[in-house]
A protein has these predicted regions:
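Phosphate-centric recognition/catalysis
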Residues: 1-16
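Pre-recognition alpha-helix immediately N-terminal to the DNA-recognition helix
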Residues: 18-22
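Short capping segments at the starts of secondary-structure elements
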Residues: 26-32
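A short acidic, leucine-rich amphipathic alpha-helix
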Residues: 32-39
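Short, charge-patterned binding micro-sites
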Residues: 39-41, 73
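Short amphipathic alpha-helical interaction segments
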Residues: 43-53
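Short basic alpha-helical hairpin corresponding to helix-turn-helix/winged-helix-like nucleic-acid-binding
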Residues: 54-94
Length: 94
């Protein structure tokens, strides 16, 4: 029996959120709400709402992924609390 049959599955996310997540995974620098909205052919208010919701959910769940807004835009980062593990992994080259 999997989580879907036991009723413990996470709710499905919207296509808009899925697309925002995918874009944020591949950016080299923060993406502005305006740039995301243009790429997604969406209103900036919709994109902004998706970003804030995702940011809150990641924080609430204690995710190792931190979605941060900088003056340049939005980007995924690793949580500061996990810096030692990330640093060890990067330095060891594993």
């Amino acid at each position: 029996m999997d989580a879907h049959t036991e009723g413990t599955a996470l709710p499905l996310i919207s296509q808009m959120r899925s697309r925002v997540e995918s874009i944020l995974l591949v950016v080299d620098s923060p993406a502005s709400v305006e740039a995301l909205a243009r790429a997604l052919d969406a209103e900036t208010t919709v994109v902004s709402d998706v970003l804030r919701s995702l940011q809150g959910e990641l924080t609430e769940r204690g995710s190792g992924i931190d979605l941060r807004e900088t003056p340049e835009g939005w980007r995924f980062y690793t949580r500061k609390e996990n810096a030692d593990a990330v640093e060890q992994f990067v330095l060891d080259g594993t």
